[in-house]
């Protein structure tokens, strides 16, 4: 990355267009996978393969000297297993790289979905609060009506319950929003209680 690009990734601003880079650089799972892959690559795979081949040759020598068919068959089976393991180990590092890349792509997609969800939850909370304000007005109006004999105690209690139910819905929505916010921050390298500035998701 350029110095300017690094600066934008570290500016405490969460932008939709930067999610892939943030995942690549700061996601704990991606960082762990990258470390594991480097360790695997640092091993001399050719030496490991050669060691397997030597072991297999030794087994074949034992098989040639086997004094019965059962021993020969058993050694031949062992040689076959080792050959398969040698081939698998030789390919493991690159296969892991492919799997890690696929996992990283999935994490980017999840982060994108979560950022969209976070924006939608903000609109949802606004609507819930607007509805709550209306229900509060209705409750107060019902109280006023009861004072002049135009509504019953039951009407007042029903109106009050509507306000309380709406408060519960708002609380649930806020908790859900906080969970998404916290998990998204952790995915992108921020702390769980971080409060980065979150930009709007661009329109498709």
Sequence positions of predicted segments:
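Bacterial Sec-pathway N-terminal export signals of envelope proteins
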Residues: 1-60, 64-67, 71, 78, ...
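Short amphipathic coiled-coil heptad-repeat segments
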Residues: 176-199
């Amino acid at each position: 990355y350029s110095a300017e690009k690094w600066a934008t990734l570290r500016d405490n601003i969460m932008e939709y267009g930067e999610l892939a880079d943030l995942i690549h650089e700061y996601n704990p799972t991606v960082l762990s996978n990258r470390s594991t892959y480097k360790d695997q690559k640092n091993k001399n795979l050719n030496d490991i393969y050669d060691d397997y081949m030597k072991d297999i040759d030794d087994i074949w020598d034992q098989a040639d000297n086997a004094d019965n068919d059962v021993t020969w068959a058993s050694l031949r089976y062992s040689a076959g297993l080792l050959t398969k393991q040698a081939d698998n180990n030789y390919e493991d590092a690159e296969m892991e790289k492919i799997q890690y890349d696929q996992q990283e792509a999935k994490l980017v997609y999840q982060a994108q979905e979560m950022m969209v969800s976070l924006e939608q939850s903000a609109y949802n909370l606004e609507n819930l609060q607007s509805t709550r304000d209306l229900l509060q007005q209705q409750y107060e109006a019902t109280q006023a009506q009861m004072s002049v004999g135009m509504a019953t105690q039951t009407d007042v209690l029903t109106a009050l319950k509507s306000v309380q139910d709406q408060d519960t819905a708002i609380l649930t929505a806020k908790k859900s929003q906080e969970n998404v916010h916290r998990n998204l921050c952790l995915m992108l390298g921020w702390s769980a209680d971080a409060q980065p500035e979150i930009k709007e998701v661009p329109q498709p």
